[in-house]
A protein has these predicted regions:
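N-terminal leader/targeting segments and the immediately adjacent pre-domain N-terminus
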Residues: 2-118, 146, 212, 389-404
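Extended ligand-binding groove/face enriched in aromatic
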Residues: 96, 124, 160-207
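Active-site-proximal alpha-helical segments within enzyme catalytic domains
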Residues: 230-237, 276-299, 355-371
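Active-site Gly/Thr loop motif
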Residues: 261-264, 312-366
Length: 404
């Protein structure tokens, strides 16, 4: 065989191998799909159809679906943020809102979809899933699957005995105080969080394998350090404590009793493990039910789903290092939920790209907002101002209507 022919054949084989790796027809994790996930041209569609991006496990709709009674309310035309008047319509467009739903006193008073989204769409949660994991942890505690929040991880996940994770109490996973060394900086190409995505989504490694041997930077329970592996480990504890995959336990403990109207899906790694720190996909109406459960102090249709006092414990932490200003100027943290600066009986679930479920106990309001906002960090304080304005406006309108 001539040298030139051999070189040509070798080159062709290398190109074929590269194309095969890039498109990977034998696996659901295709780099060609992964690299388009966040691309401006595709993300609007991807965030509403993640079943075409990742493998998943189904969470069936409840056999007894619940619909909120309907009412009618408008949004404030303007709101104040940082001393400036913000036009609501402009804000909704600028933050690339795909859905907005407002509940007042358990009534659906506003529901609207944008950017071609519909009520049937399953919107991806990103880190709102963390609050769902926190909620499931509370239910597992109430039902006796978890004995105490002070139990160490190794008591439930024997594989982590001897690892830095093993000695971390469940409580410190919930309040993001594990002490584990990890960088959750999305803007740095090779940060730990981006390498977690690369290794799990592109290289096909199991998510647990990627994070199991992370080292400790400090003892647990000393400072707030928000990192996604805390939630992934918490999900591992949940699976072992309940004896069920996370999605299956969510179906039994949350979806069925809450009367979730629509099927949800939870994205998986290649080994079939739920990506607990992100990637739950559900409809806007069902997102709002999660907020309403917390507004009702964990009670749903006369059934106490969360431990008594859980909502107060989760949203009103006494630790000064969990307050706003410890890593995030406009918000602090609780048990896997966020608390705005200077809270007035309010807290929220939040995910990147602008996913928010807001709960105002003072105004008896829940606001659920889904988005594809690339400037979500820059807009965070403004989103809080918007949520507060909507809560106050809707509550005031309701009181006015009640007075006749």
């Amino acid at each position: 065989m001539k040298r030139s022919t051999l070189i040509l054949l070798t080159t062709a084989l290398l190109v074929l191998a590269a194309l095969s790796w890039w498109y990977r027809p034998w696996t659901p994790y295709s780099p060609s799909v992964m690299t388009r996930l966040l691309h401006p041209e595709y993300r609007l569609q991807n965030f509403r159809q993640m079943e075409k991006v990742f493998p998943f496990r189904v969470i069936p709709a409840s056999s007894e679906p619940f619909s909120f009674p309907r009412g009618e309310a408008s949004l404030p035309e303007q709101f104040i943020h940082d001393g400036r008047v913000i036009d609501t319509a402009e804000f909704m467009l600028r933050t690339q809102t795909t859905g907005l739903m407002v509940l007042h006193q358990g009534t659906n008073v506003f529901e609207q979809y944008y950017l071609e989204a519909t009520r049937e769409d399953r919107f991806t949660s990103w880190s709102v899933a963390k609050s769902v994991i926190g909620t499931l942890t509370a239910i597992a505690l109430k039902d006796g699957h978890i004995a105490s929040l002070d139990d160490p991880v190794k008591q439930y996940v024997s594989e982590l005995d001897g690892a830095a994770w093993g000695e971390v109490p469940i409580r410190d996973l919930l309040r993001m105080a594990s002490g584990i060394q990890f960088s959750e900086v999305y803007d740095e190409k090779f940060s730990d969080i981006n390498m977690l995505f690369y290794r799990t989504f592109l290289l096909g490694e199991g998510v647990r394998d990627v994070i199991a041997d992370l080292p400790a930077a400090r003892p647990p329970g000393e400072i707030f350090h928000y990192v996604s592996p805390n939630t992934q480990i918490l999900g591992w504890v949940l699976e072992r404590a309940t004896g069920k995959p996370i999605a299956e336990y969510a179906a039994e403990a949350l979806w069925q009793p809450l009367g979730m109207q629509d099927e949800a899906i939870w994205s998986l790694d290649q080994g079939g493990v739920e990506l607990g720190f992100c990637c739950l996909n559900m409809t806007l109406r069902d997102y709002s039910k999660l907020g309403q459960l917390y507004l009702q102090q964990g009670v749903w249709q006369d059934r106490q789903l969360l431990p008594e006092g859980w909502v107060e414990q989760a949203s009103r932490r006494p630790e000064p290092w969990l307050a706003a200003g410890n890593g995030y100027p406009e918000r602090g943290y609780g048990y896997h939920l966020w608390v705005p600066k200077d809270p007035d009986q309010e807290f929220f679930f939040n995910g990147v790209w602008g996913q928010t479920v807001w709960v105002s106990e003072k105004h008896n309001v829940v606001v659920a907002k889904t988005s594809v906002d690339p400037l979500f960090r820059q807009h965070m304080a403004e989103v809080i101002s918007f949520m507060r304005a909507v809560s106050e406006f809707v509550a005031a309108a309701g009181e006015k209507n009640n007075r006749g």
